[in-house]
């Protein structure tokens, strides 16, 4: 088996996790209590006869009673958000030990998440992680969900990643991170938290898929016609991307991509590991009946900034690597034609040291949408993961905000009070300046 453990940290990580497992259950025919629907049960039995290791088991563990339990852990330093899962629709899906919450929150403070409050729960979290890992025949790695801007998401995650590297050094660690949006901010100190956590986790993560709320908010508003998108609307779009990335781990397919393959194909140098995500088609239910989306259409759409889940202009950068993950009614011949057309367009530029650049995954299971959600059901979809130098725009924006506050030493006392030193801020900021330079260097011709 090649199991994956998902760890959902802080408010953003948990809310995305809740939506994620809701979608996985729909895709696999698992009811909110963990029991497989009868029709799916027959298919599952047949699948298990055909494949002794049904891909299904990479994300779910089957108990003796025949219940399917997610291989997941939810962690927060305060109980409010996790209590929502404990009392929500999927409360019977998870074992109580998978839902871990502390008594006091990190108060949007990296230092509290990493040092003071976080240090009190880290051993318990690692113990629960060990329990989940012991249930795996061949753990391939971790999927970590969090935000850069929150105290728990930034601080506690960096502490946990460090410890996971110590205990599971050979395992792949992929992150899904909510990056601070250019104009929408949930906390004034987001730039501090984001710079500190990027510095402290860079060497402990293999690949970080970034999403920003403003980009997703705009997509929901513009393409789905949602007047004021809620967190639920935003998360349901984000989890379509997560589902596309993990589909090849959960379903059999002709051109499937393994966890370690993402890293191998997307990360040319260890530090350059922040791919952007894009998704197509994004269409509302009332428009879907009037439009047909060919493989060529959806492939073209993915290279447009309006379909990307991070605010930056891909035309300003060069692509180093690109992973195209198709789902549904897609054949390789059409994909090859779409890629050839993309390469002929001048707006899509690759660095000269990586002229081929495309990795393709095809999974024949069509995408599933949430009933009553904003997205329409479609026959085929694409998720694009691209490592492009254009992402440097996002880092530059973040560093600028950090500099404005740090020049006045604004809000610094909250961090120093928790035991941090100014030197840590300077070191983190220097590391991000180096990251900007790294991206600029790889874009240059030899």
UniProtKB/Swiss-Prot annotation:
The protein's name in its UniProt record: Tubulin alpha chain-like 3
Subunit structure and binding partners: Dimer of alpha and beta chains. A typical microtubule is a hollow water-filled tube with an outer diameter of 25 nm and an inner diameter of 15 nM. Alpha-beta heterodimers associate head-to-tail to form protofilaments running lengthwise along the microtubule wall with the beta-tubulin subunit facing the microtubule plus end conferring a structural polarity. Microtubules usually have 13 protofilaments but different protofilament numbers can be found in some organisms and specialized cells.
EC number(s) given by UniProt: 3.6.5.-
Summary of the function given for this chain in its UniProt record: Tubulin is the major constituent of microtubules, a cylinder consisting of laterally associated linear protofilaments composed of alpha- and beta-tubulin heterodimers. Microtubules grow by the addition of GTP-tubulin dimers to the microtubule end, where a stabilizing cap forms. Below the cap, tubulin dimers are in GDP-bound state, owing to GTPase activity of alpha-tubulin.
Chief localisation class: cytoplasm
Binding-site positions, Mg(2+): 78
Subcellular location: Cytoplasm, Cytoskeleton
Listed SUPFAM superfamilies: Tubulin C-terminal domain-like, Tubulin nucleotide-binding domain-like
Cofactor: Mg(2+)
Residue ranges of the motif MREC motif: 1-4
Cellular component terms (Gene Ontology): cytoplasm; microtubule
Post-translational changes noted in the entry: Some glutamate residues at the C-terminus are polyglutamylated, resulting in polyglutamate chains on the gamma-carboxyl group. Polyglutamylation plays a key role in microtubule severing by spastin (SPAST). SPAST preferentially recognizes and acts on microtubules decorated with short polyglutamate tails: severing activity by SPAST increases as the number of glutamates per tubulin rises from one to eight, but decreases beyond this glutamylation threshold. Glutamylation is also involved in cilia motility.
Reactions that this protein is recorded to catalyse: GTP + H2O = GDP + phosphate + H(+)
Keyword flag Magnesium: yes
